[in-house]
Amino acid sequence: MSSEEHKKKLLYGVHFLQFLDASGAEKKEELDTSTAILKKKKKPNSLIVTDAVNDDNSTISLSNNTMDTLGLFRGDTVTVRGKKRKETVLIVLADDDLDDGSARINRVVRHNLRVKHGDIITVHPCPDIKYAKRIAVLPIADTVEGLTGSLFDVYLAPYFRDGYRPVKQGDLFTVRGGMRQVEFKVVEVDPPEFGIVAPDTIIHSEGEPIQREDEENNLNEVGYDDIGGCRKQMAQIRELVELPLRHPQLFKSIGIKPPRGILMYGPPGTGKTLMARAVANETGAFFFLINGPEIMSKMAGESESNLRKAFEEAEKNSPAIIFIDEIDSIAPKREKTNGEVERRVVSQLLTLMDGMKARSNVVVMAATNRPNSIDPALRRFGRFDREVDIGIPDPTGRLEILSIHTKNMKLGEDVDLETIAAETHGYVGSDLASLCSEAAMQQIREKMDLIDLDEDTIDAEVLDSLGVTMENFRYALGVSNPSALREVAVVEVPNVRWEDIGGLEEVKRELIESVQYPVDHPEKFQKFGLSPSRGVLFYGPPGTGKTMLAKAVANECAANFISVKGPELLSMWFGESESNIRDIFDKARAAAPCVVFLDELDSIAKSRGGSVGDAGGASDRVVNQLLTEMDGMTSKKNVFVIGATNRPEQLDAALVRPGRLDTLVYVPLPDQASREGILKAQLRKTPVASDVDIEFIASKTHGFSGADLGFVTQRAVKLAIKESISAEIERQKQREAAGEDVKMEDEEEGEDPVPELTRAHFEEAMKTARRSVSDVEIRRYEAFAQSLKNSGGSSFFRFPSANEAADSGNTFGEAGNDDSLYD
């Protein structure tokens, strides 16, 4: 994919990985009005940045056609606007080789405008710029280290002499002279902001040099470009904040009041605070930050007074944004708080937001990750008008975020950000930032042998050789998991694959159809208008591989995997068990696509009504909660439930109906071919002698489950290890007896006494082998499986052929006519 296509994909949010929505239909890419504010309007003075041919800090080169269109002449002064409301003043030069619609500016000017190659800048004529009476400039400290003599005589005087250069307060410029390049910053211009340095302009250059760190801190202001993965939410926030602050007349002319406040909510780490800062930087508004807990005070009336001061300050400096972080700490529900202070603070906030003048150009933004614990009076129209859900990003959003975090990183050729984005389900922005830094740290660890920590400096070659590889990202993926799921005990993308599971071909095929097809072929489900299956129940004797199958499913679909052991959900506290189930499904929805594996399902989903005297019917309530969660899931995200039990007859009937756990899969004891497959899968990393007949072992282990066969192979391996260790000890003793030196570590190894598993090991292991499932139990499972088959619909159902249709016979006979029941 070319970089241009890649940009387009990022810009328009093309889905690299397509998942289904609740109805089973793929979400169509729609060009709707909700993101209209993000679209850049094409104007003649909007130009694309390209690299400059000359290295002058005060010029911008345009093509002749562009100059004619904008009514400019060579030598005119123009103001040029870049990103984050940065602007500077430059002199126009003509360039015949330049394309129309492009502008050449050098590295220093690009830095001042916060733009890079390919970004858009706007050019405006500025004929009324005055000559500066005086300017003050200071050098950047690291560029003047070791310099002696007058900076003014060597650098500044030749640079400004007869140049009539325009300058803007806050801009940097570089000057070459005397074998060095020195960087300066314009700290003051009189008259303020812009000015042209004429021969009679006084230039001050006395003072302490500016530290590079202080300058870098100013650069780290976040803008819209630093936010990825929430295009729609960004559009909502921009139209609610930018329009009232920059164009209040829009609302006046249409006759409505501009919005007062926005409440952003979502899981931690999705970028709520970052968004507020970006909006403030890009709009140029005064930004007043209130950290929720900071304004609370033990003195009576002080907390309310702190709030009032914040609002007064913002109104004085309008246009302004007041950002209240963690608003749930200062505005909890009044009926549920015991503290009088919190109640008064909530009331004060309500009156302040009501008392804000309609067009005072102040917008209140608030962020929380617990929107339901905020006082409801705050969430009505006229206070926090709009609530914006900043959720977990989809694969396209994750790719945007990864591109932002890796733009300053040195990446290896093999790094594929699209693959990483596809594999990081459930990761939010902060998780992806942590992933990138972990990958970089791993690269540094690999080069640690080249770095001498006692030295003050590190070789330039070592620094040059650092580059983050895909292998580093793979390592980072292995050690990190999404923050939304950290509270759930077992969340992993398991490392079990289909080939690790021997046999069970029929079961595997059914699972691939139920689980993998909806993820891999969403367009097929969309074509037939079908919503995919949401759950599978494995039942069968213990040790047949039910848990392993669930892990393989999650891995093959590249989904997150939450493993829940039935009994650990139950709690002695009233309502706690149901709450645990609710939390697990909430987490799964947040990290979708996700497989929730409920092991030992019979412990929490027994048939209702039979539990007499059981803690107020706790298990019945747990079943009810489970049923409602599984019904609610279909309307939510890609969450798939797999249940496993070896007592299927005890499960509640409502749980195994179509729409919940609708696919019932009997995982039987393996037949001979499956046993052979299991043994081969278990021994695939083990050296086995060529005369060991796996097929013969499989034929002699009738009635053994996968776990029983695992015991046989494990026992055989243990015997081989024991024999190997005994032989080594024996050899050592013989050496010592012969008076030989004890073998050194780097000496050649003798012949391995036990190089592989032999027949003898298996023969010995089979002596202790036993079946874990009795014939009686097997008959019980098979009877249950048979009863499910028999309770199915008519297996002889078929549509009548054309000539039969003429007879209009009833396919089901008289029994099919149920109308008489209701007569």
From Swiss-Prot:
Role of this protein: Involved in spindle disassembly, degradation of ubiquitinated proteins and protein export from the endoplasmic reticulum to the cytoplasm. Acts as a chaperone that collects ubiquitinated substrates. Has a role in the endoplasmic reticulum-associated degradation (ERAD) pathway. Component of the ribosome quality control complex (RQC), a ribosome-associated complex that mediates ubiquitination and extraction of incompletely synthesized nascent chains for proteasomal degradation. Cdc48 may provide the mechanical force that dislodges the polyubiquitinated nascent peptides from the exit channel.
Biased composition (Basic and acidic residues): 729-742
Alphabetical UniProt keywords: ATP-binding, Cell cycle, Nucleotide-binding, Protein transport, Repeat, Stress response, Transport
GO biological process: autophagosome maturation; mitotic spindle disassembly; proteasome-mediated ubiquitin-dependent protein catabolic process; retrograde protein transport, ER to cytosol
Gene: cdc48
CDD domains documented for this protein: RecA-like_CDC48_r1-like (cd19519), RecA-like_CDC48_r2-like (cd19528)
Species, as recorded: Emericella nidulans (strain FGSC A4 / ATCC 38163 / CBS 112.46 / NRRL 194 / M139)
SMART domains: AAA (SM00382), CDC48_2 (SM01072), CDC48_N (SM01073)
Biased composition (Acidic residues): 743-754
Keyword rRNA processing among record annotations: no
Gene Ontology MF term list: ATP binding; ATP hydrolysis activity; polyubiquitin modification-dependent protein binding
Induction: Up-regulated when grown with elevated levels of potassium chloride.
Record-stated family: Belongs to the AAA ATPase family.
A GO cellular-component term linked to this record: cytosol
PANTHER family, alphabetized: AAA-FAMILY ATPASE, NUCLEAR VALOSIN-CONTAINING PROTEIN-LIKE
Superkingdom per UniProt: Eukaryota
PROSITE patterns in UniProt: AAA (PS00674)
Pfam families: AAA (PF00004), AAA_lid_3 (PF17862), CDC48_2 (PF02933), CDC48_N (PF02359), Vps4_C (PF09336)
Subunit structure: Component of the ribosome quality control complex (RQC), composed of the E3 ubiquitin ligase ltn1, rqc1 and rqc2, as well as cdc48 and its ubiquitin-binding cofactors. RQC forms a stable complex with 60S ribosomal subunits.
TM segment ranges: none
Residues annotated to bind ATP: 268-274, 369, 405
Residue segments, region Disordered: 729-754, 799-823
Stated name of the protein: Cell division control protein 48
